């Protein structure tokens, strides 16, 4: 999955460069690797509790599918976007405009994607990319700006209440989610019904 590989590569580069100099560490979390199975709850509720609630930001990537519905939203990805917005956390949404095979085109899914874009177009939270290179550039630029802004805000908060000392240089871990709804729907599984989701912590 190229976009996931790109995000991992960008995060590694950030951690090795500005992350190292700024004492910030970005950690990626992926639902299939980082969510522990639980009984008695809906799959999306488990995702939200174990990963979403602990994350500082989310990256959501849409191909030509919007994902599988949850109890409350049209897809798990959309639920996570809405919950993060409600909490005032950072949301990055990317739509792939890369070429796809005709056999992969689903007009019903495409209609849902367009409706989603229309709903969010005035909220300024999504970007359309046409190639892997463009996606790489967007993610790198957006994450870098986000992290430098977060650090500046942290410094300002400290300076408002205490004198500046070595405490501000303690390593800060940033939780960042990304949710990936690619060019297909996965089969329903016991732990989760959406496409691929990765969290960054």
Description of each model-found segment:
Residues 1-201:
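Conserved catalytic or regulatory cores that recognize and/or transform ribose-phosphate-containing ligands
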């Amino acid at each position: 999955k190229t976009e996931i590989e790109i995000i991992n590569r960008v995060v590694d580069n950030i951690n090795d460069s500005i992350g190292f100099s700024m004492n910030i560490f970005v950690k990626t979390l992926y639902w299939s690797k980082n969510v522990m199975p639980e009984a008695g709850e809906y799959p999306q509720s488990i995702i939200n509790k174990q990963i979403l609630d602990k994350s500082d930001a989310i990256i959501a990537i849409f191909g030509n599918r919007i994902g599988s519905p949850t109890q409350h939203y049209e897809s798990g990805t959309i639920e996570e976007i809405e919950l993060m917005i409600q909490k005032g956390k950072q949301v990055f949404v990317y739509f792939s405009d890369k070429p796809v095979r005709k056999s992969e085109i689903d007009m019903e899914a495409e209609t849902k994607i367009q409706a989603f874009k229309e709903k969010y177009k005035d909220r300024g939270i999504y970007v359309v990319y046409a190639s892997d290179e463009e996606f790489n550039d967007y993610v790198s630029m957006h994450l870098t700006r986000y992290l430098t802004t977060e650090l500046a805000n942290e410094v300002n908060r400290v300076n408002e209440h205490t004198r500046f000392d070595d405490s501000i240089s303690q390593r800060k871990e940033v939780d960042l989610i990304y949710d990936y709804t690619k060019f297909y729907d996965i089969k329903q599984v016991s732990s989760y019904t959406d496409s691929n989701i990765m969290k960054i912590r």
